Structure formats: structure tokens, C-alpha cells
Amino acid sequence: MVDTKTPGDKTLSMPSKTLTLKPRVEQGVVRQSFSHGRSKQVVVEKRGKRRIGGDGAPEPAAAPEVAKKPAPAPAPAAPSPRQQPRPSPQQQARSGMVLRTLTEDERSARATALADARVREVEERRQAEIEAQRRAAQEVVDKAEREAAEARRKAEEERHRHEEETKRKAETEAKKRFGETEPAARKPADGGRPAAGATTTAPRAPVTTTTTRPPAVAAEAGDDDEAPRMVRRGPGGGPARPAPPPKQPAAKPGASKQRGRLTLVTALNADDVRERSIASFRRRTQRLKGHASNEPKEKLVREVIVPEAISIQELANRMSERAVDVIRLLMKQGAMHKINDVIDADTAQLIAEELGHTVKRVAASDVEEGLFDVVDNSTDTEPRSPVVTVMGHVDHGKTSLLDALRHANVVSGEAGGITQHIGAYQVTSPESGKKITFIDTPGHAAFTAMRARGAKVTDIVVLVVAADDGVMPQTIEAINHAKAANVPIIVAINKIDKPDAKPERVRTELLQYNVQVESLGGDVVDVEVSAKNKTNLDKLLEMIALQAELLDLKTNEQRPAEGTVIEAKLDRGRGPVATVLVQRGTLKVGDIIVAGAEMGRVRALISDQGDTVDSAGPSVPVEVLGFNGPPEAGDRLAVVENEARARQVTSYRAHQKREKAASIVGMRGSLEQMMSQLKTTGRKDFPLIVKADVQGSLEAILGSLEKLGTDEVAARILHAGVGGISESDVTLAEGFSAVILGFSVRANKEAAAAAKRNGIEIRYYNIIYDLVDDIKKAMSGLLAPTLRETMLGNAQILEIFNISKVGKVAGCRVTDGTVERGANVRLIRDNVVVHEGKLSTLKRFKDEVKEVQSGQECGMAFENYTDMRAGDVIECYRVETIQRSL
């Protein structure tokens, strides 16, 4: 290869201009204003998009626009330069240049790039047109808004100009009419405010209102938001020359925080004087009031109502104190509490008194205040009938005596001829014509609670004692009840018609219990009567009337009624029915009543004769219909003013009743824990469901069943209530395999069918003693039987024999009693029992016998025991199983 240089060849050289990249980021500094005249400088950067020019150099960055102008429509793309014709090979040879021919792939790539460039150019042109249309529409909207704002500004300026003109005319007219001139203000102090207490007499020139506030005033004002806006005065007292308006509306340091805010209203009212806002005026007034009242405020003392338990938050609210202060006081006393903790009344009282408040203690039982024992005015009282309770031992003739007085026959209608309910009747005295109320009580031991209730509501107790029987246990109990109730006693010695009657013996026996009759020098009246022959009944009524006169029984009938529930039951057709003895006031139909935890409205009143009455006065027994549920016997009845008060009282009493029941259950649990583990785990329960006709009978049944319980077996009352046996009672009994007891009640059709279907036993009773005896026998069957040993005889071993197929056999002589085969035996060696078992073999000579008498010799063998020695003693005994009973 020859290295030659062709003429006309060009040499490689660098362009004269060096390629550089201009920065895309432009920096500027702007000042940002804040409230209270604060500002700071902020560096702003603007990044531009790098564009490459046609010659390969980057285009210069566009200068930042001062005002936003719509971008012009993009110019049409410049036509591509015309392609020059390719030089011929002769021309290439003459120029000395050798051009490389493009390959097919390169020509294809260039064609593709040109096509893509054309498509991209069309797309950019379309996007530019859309952007131009959007900018044009936005410009139209902006122009409309500017025109509307300009119109509003002009209208506002016109309104202000009209108001100023009207005001100026009014001032001029007033000056012309009255000839008054305003006093000139005194020269202001250094702070720009007039001196305190200064007075001026020089006339003051009219103040010219300036549309723009001078900067000097803004700089000197210490609190531009709070202090009133004043116009700066000149040295002569006249208005100072207005300062030129500021050239720029930018906020100055110390200016008000509102001057930096640009709103539409401030933009339109830029030439007006800024007035004090309502909020600023209120703040200034409050601050002045606060400075004026430097005297300490007097603490407001409140009367705080403190219940038995109260939370800290509630206590703080009632005292109008902060709960934090209350907790702080508790912490000083060494108690750590939270805001929702409950404290007792004593602690709450200490806190309230510590904070200077007065305390009024209240209790939950305050809802019962005013229900009972309200003192009546003596001028409003009138005499009332006496209430007499007949008490005594069973079968001493109490009910028969009342039947003779009432000319009725109650005894024949009673089950078993015994009284099991407490009854109330009214009898009219044949001589005086006055009414006497009698209350008949049961005499059996199971009805102790009934007798106690009868003694509490009575004025006089008639103690019936049989002349042939004398003083009995229930007679003594009746005497104790009468003394506990502090009521006088009249002794009625009954059955004097019997041949073996001994009234004197009765009087003598009563002396042992501090009951001294008049015939023996005492003050207790005694009357010998005969209920069967109706002997001396008029004398008994006369003694009762005389005793009532001595008691001087009076009450106020014109007041809300008070009374006592003697008996209560659940009647199937009438609902809850309560026998009530009215003691004070008058009970009327429609009254709202409360008795125990039950309330209601009186729907009907039924007298002892079965008649419906509208009202019942003092000492009148009536049946009351209208309770929500049957009350308990012995509850006190009261009439309240409205249902709200009745609900409060019943709610409180129901809560007390639940707490009492819970405490009893807890106490029983603690006693059971104190018992031994054997007794606790070994006790068997006898589940029962008891339904009775009246509350008093149910109470007596439950008391009797509770007394039957022991450490080994006890009656478990699943449910006890007043009324008939329902299907729900059968369902409950099925779940616990219990027995249902019905006392003077029956099961309805559905309950009887369900009991028969599920195999539940229902037992019906009319006499309480039959019920108690049956349950006692059933509970006795749950007791473990007692094992008792019966000694049969003793034998002494003389010699031991070894017999094949049998083993060791003891040759013995029976020393006492008899020895039986199969009986239990003990082997005693040196007075120590070494074996207990059964006698398996008993032979007399070579024959098997059942028993061997004393003095005879025999052979004995034990079951599974062969360690027998000569000289051992054998005890033979029999074990008997004896069934126990309660």
C-alpha cells in the first residue's frame, strides 16, 4: 500500500467554538411577609427544560416572565431541507473524497426514524392546538371575573362616597343650626396619646379623614389590634399634615397582623379607614374589667347533698369544684383514687367541708319518709273500734268461740278441724252497738309467725285456755307475744261445761308466767265461757268494750290510709288478693298503695261478709284487689300520692330484699365451709317445689321443712310461691327431679298432663302436719342405715389340727352363748384383735352343724385365714342393719 496524499483532501480539525452546557436552574430572591410585621427572604429556584438546538448546542434558557401572557400558537414545522443529488463517481474522484455506501439495514433504520419523527410532529401540533384553546377559554373566564370585581369595587366606592357626602352635609347642617364647636384636643404625650386627666378649652379644628394610614402612626402604635385608632395631631393641636401614601402595599414590621391579609373586601375597601372589630372591642372590654376588679372574689358556698355512696366526679360536680382538687385532698389523706371511684358518705362529707361547703346527708331509705307514723292533730281524731286477737293452744276452742260470737260456723269448713289461716272478722256488740274487730290466729306450733303478726296489729289479746287442759306450750308462746307487743290480755277460760273442767287450776298455772288474774289480786281480766253452750259471751264482749274505753282508742279518718297485710294469696280469677287491716285513715277504691315490694291501684274492696264496699275506715278488715303481685304477710300498707313515688319505694324495698337474700346465702356458705369435709360432701338434698294458697301457710310450711334438715340430709326448696301449680313448675321439677307439693291448691290441666307425661310426682295436702310427716319419711329414706352388732357367743381354741383338703382347723370349746356358721367372728390374741372375718366351717365331731351351744366342743375354720394358735379367743357376733329416721 502506497502512502500518498491526494490533493483536495480535508484534514481533521476541532470546531472553533467549544461545546458547553448552560445551567438549567435560575435562582432569585423574594421576601415573604408574615403577621405582626415579620418577614424573611426566600431563595426561589426555577428549573427549565433543556432543549438541544439544530446545531447541537443547548438553547438559551428563556427569561422569566414578569406577567403571564398567553403562549402563541406553535409555528408550523419547517420543511425538511431538499436533499442534494448524490455526486457521481467522477466528481468523487476529482474531489478526492471516498463516500461509504449505506447498507440496507441503515437505510431501513433511517426511514423508520423519519416516519416516527413525522408522527411525533403531528401529535405535538395537535397537543399545542388543544392547549391554545384551553388558555383562550381560561382567559375569557379571568376577564369576566376581573370585570365583575371592578364593577363591585366601583359600586362600593360610590356607596362610600355617597355616605361620606351625606355625613358631611349632616355635620355642616348641625354646625349651622346650633353653632357648636368641638373642643380641641390637648397635645398628645410622647406615646401619641393625650395625657390622663388633661382638659382643653381651645377649639378643635375639624378632623380630616385620610384614606390611607400614615406609616408613622402604624409604627408608633404599640398594640394596633387592641388600641383605638387615632389620628396623629400636630404641635398646635390641629391635624398634622397627612403623610404621603405608601408606594407599595407591602406590610411593614410592626404592622397589624391583618394588614398582610389580602381579601376581596380589603382589596375593594383599601382606601377606607380601618375600624375596630367586634371581637377586638370585646377583648378590650374584658381586659379593662379584669384590671378594674382586683379585689379577690368571694367563694360561693353551696349545700351539697351527699348520699350513702357517691363517685368523685359526681361529688365534684355537686360542689362545682374540679375533680383534680378532690383527688388531691384524698391523696393528702393517704388514699389513692381515680375520678370514677366511689367513696362513702363520711369521706365525701370531709372533702366538702374541707372545701368550705355545707353537707346534707341523705340515705336511700329517705324515700320511705312520711309513709308511716305521721302525727295527727288531736282535734281531728275520732274514736275507733278495738282490734282483738284471739290466741291460744291448738284445740282450745278459739275458732269455736269466734263462731259463737259471730253466729257462724267456720270450724266445719276447715280442713281437719284446725285453723291454718289468719282471719279477720267484725262483730257488733249487742248491748253497746259498737263494732269489735276480731283476728283469729292458728294455734299450732308451725304458725308462730302468724301469731306474732296478730299480736303486733292488735289492741287487746284474748287468751283462750281450755279448763280441762290448762296451760300448754302454745299458750305460753301467746303470752310472750302479747307481752312483746305490750298489749293487755283478757283470759277466756273455755270449755267450762265439761265435767273435768278446773278453772282454778288454770288461774294458778298462769301465775307461773306473770299473768295474775283479778280474782288472785292481779289486773288481768278473766272470764269463764263456753263456746259450745254460748255461756258468758255477752260478759266477754262487755269486758272487751270496757278495756277499749280504758285504752281511749282514737284516730283520724280523713287522711291517707295506713294498715297491715294480715294475709295474702294469689287467686286464679281475681289475681293477687291481700287481707288488710286498716289502722289509720280511710282506704278508698282508686288509691295508689304500696305494701312491701309490691304496689298497685285499689280495684275493689271486699268486706268480711263478702260485700263490695267503696271505702274502709280504721279497724276495718277488707280484702284488697289490685296489687301487681301478692305482698308478704306482715307488710305495712300505705297510700301514696302518685305512681312515681310508689315506684321509688318499691324499687328501694326490692333492692333491700335482694341484698338480704344474698347476705343469707353468703352466711350459709361460710357456715358450710366451717363444717368438716365429710359432712359437707356427704349431705344429700331433697329437692322440693312448694305451692300454697296463702302467704302465711307457705311461710309456715317452709319453716317446718327447714327444721327437718340435718348434716346428712336437708330439704332443698327450688321454688316456693302462692297460687296454683303451673306448667313452668313442672318443667322446673323435671330439670331437678323434684317433688311438687300443693297445699290447698291444685294443678291446672296442662300442668297435670305434663307431670304425667314426664313422670313428675305431685302431692296434694290440706293439713300441714300431713305434709310435714310425709316429707320427713321421704327424707329419712335418704339417710344411711345404722349397723348394730349383736353378740352371739365366745369360744376358746384348745388345739390346732391340720386336715388335708381343708387346712388348719381349730378345736374349740364354746364358753359363752352360741356359735353360728356364717356369722362374723373376731380372733383375739392377748386381748388384741388380730383378725375379723366370717366363720366358714363349723363341725360337731365329723358333721357340719349350723350352731353349737355353750359347753360343747367343735371344730372351726375361717375364710382366707389360717394363723390360729392355741389359747386364742373367738368372738362370734351378728351385724344388723337398722333404718334411721329424722
Swiss-Prot record:
InterPro entries: EF-G-like_DII, EFTu-like_2, IF2_assoc_dom_bac, IF2_II, IF2_N, P-loop_NTPase, Small_GTP-bd, T_Tr_GTP-bd_dom
Ranges for region Disordered: 1-261
Region G2, annotated ranges: 417-421
Residues in tr-type G domain copies: 383-554
PROSITE patterns attached to this UniProt entry: G_TR_2, IF2
Regions of compositional bias (Low complexity) in chain numbering: 191-220
Superkingdom per UniProt: Bacteria
Keywords: Cytoplasm, GTP-binding, Initiation factor, Nucleotide-binding, Protein biosynthesis
Location within or outside the cell: Cytoplasm
Stretches the record annotates as G1: 392-399
Region G5, residue ranges: 530-532
Ranges of biased composition (kind: Basic and acidic residues): 117-190
Sites where the protein binds GTP: 392-399, 440-444, 494-497
Annotated spans, G3: 440-443
Region (G4): 494-497
A GO CC term attached to the entry: cytosol
UniProt GO MF annotations: GTP binding; GTPase activity; guanosine tetraphosphate binding; translation initiation factor activity
Pro residues biased stretches: 71-88
Pfam families: EF-G_D2 (PF22042), GTP_EFTU (PF00009), GTP_EFTU_D2 (PF03144), IF-2 (PF11987), IF2_assoc (PF08364), IF2_N (PF04760)
UniProt family annotation: Belongs to the TRAFAC class translation factor GTPase superfamily. Classic translation factor GTPase family. IF-2 subfamily.
HAMAP family xrefs: IF_2_B (MF_00100_B)
Its biological purpose: One of the essential components for the initiation of protein synthesis. Protects formylmethionyl-tRNA from spontaneous hydrolysis and promotes its binding to the 30S ribosomal subunits. Also involved in the hydrolysis of GTP during the formation of the 70S ribosomal complex.
Protein name: Translation initiation factor IF-2
